[in-house]
Amino acid sequence: MTPVIHTRDLTRRYGSLAAVNGVSISLDENRIYGLLGRNGAGKTTLMSLLTGQEFATSGDIEVFGTSPVENAAVLQRVCFIKESQRYPDDFKIKHVLRSAPWFFPNWDPDFAAALVTDFNLPLNRKMKKLSRGQFSAVGVIVGLASRAPLTFFDEPYLGLDAVARQLFYDRLLADYADHPRTVVLSTHLIDEVADLLEHVLLIDAGRIIVDAPTDELRGSVVNVVGGRDAVDRFTAGREVLHSDGIGGLVSATVSRLTDAERTAARDAGLELTAVSLQQLVVRLTESTNNEFQESA
């Protein structure tokens, strides 16, 4: 089966800065992916490359088996919703929704109307007069109602309050069940979307440092908690992603413990606690950044 997205050694440079650096990924159809990373890690640049809005410095990109650059047959199957979306100054919400079918063949006007009601949007208000939350809600509606086979959300929902964000997650999951497609969510709100994500791509300094199913990733790292001496003995010779403590109590984040090692830790009086996806992302990017600084 041909992947929806396939890249090989994809690189985008701005002068001496490699915003995307040697990225090789494959994304399958009908899955929800999380594209995670810190500010400036390369998330938006990568999505801009995949949607034909940026030109690669080197490497290859295939979307639906061919290049997305100036390719109408590909781009009409793609929806890219981003926080910095721009509209004509005189556009109202109703104009955005009326023009959407020109770009998205699978547009569902009834679903869009239901979402307008859900988010309580004023259809006759100009886009430039909207609050940040209302502006974000318009992007969410377009992304969902487009039903594009490949849909990118580049943090357009940051302006939404907690209730509205949960509404977005609920509507996304429900509609995805009825109308499967490939969805890529780029967000800093990792714990909020963790249960939606089937696969995680973690990018740092332009490089993909994690490309793994979410369930596999969650089980790959654990916190080992206990007395300092016991934790130090257990973690000796192991990769420790992070360690902190208060007084004599220490917590060390370690990766890839076998069942036998987990049993040995408990027999040594140590407690094993789960690491959330957000904590894992923080620990992995901290570790990668430290390695980069040491090699610089």
Model-derived features with residue positions:
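C-terminal coupling/interaction segments
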Residues: 242, 246-296
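Helix-to-loop junction immediately C-terminal to a conserved catalytic motif
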Residues: 51
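Catalytic Walker B motif of ABC-type/P-loop ATPase nucleotide-binding domains
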Residues: 151-155, 160
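ABC-family P-loop ATPase nucleotide-binding domains
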Residues: 82-138
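Conserved ABC transporter NBD signature motif
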Residues: 27, 58-73
